[in-house]
């Protein structure tokens, strides 16, 4: 245990009581304390996970066994809202689904409380870049590569929305058998007249392997609703040339001009992968 001295008034709701008789720091205060040891990019990923609908948690073998015993014996009835995502290779997954630990308004309030503190302005600046409600690490990576300013390695697409609910028309419902679907990432042109839906593929790692919709069905249903749809894979964002082709396709769909990156911007992009 390392002791930390926090001078001044603590941010609101930054210390939480537990039923076990001890106090814990809130997720945001924990991230703030950690931030002095993290790069801006590392802090951004930490906050994105806290504000997302997923967690990456690889349990040690002993703890995994203890958790199974506790559930089987009835000592705990559930994993308290955490659901492990299936993996394609049958190995126990370290990716979990859960509700967001931090909402956008929580992040805004915390930033207003730490503004002016040491590391506070940096924390606030990084928080402005955090995607809210991402469903997987893949969505976070795709969002950052597409949405961050070009100086930080992204493509500078503005106003990207995550997990947008789309209510389907009668004809689109007939394709998927559902009344609505979710778009992983929705990009819009500055005038709002053109939109591109990006579907993140690789559902086991993406976090929605059991959503009951085949990729082709969802893509066809969204196209029936008038959306341009692109499928995005890990392989595509990992390969610079493949990803560049995707970006150029998005620019064409949004009627936006593509501009080659400078050497500094390319180096910043490499850090995001």
Model regions: which residues?
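Surface segments flanking catalytic/ligand-binding clefts of nucleic-acid enzymes
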Residues: 70-76, 80-273
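Short gly/ser-rich loop at a beta-strand->alpha-helix junction or flexible surface loop bordering the NTP-binding
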Residues: 1-119, 271-273
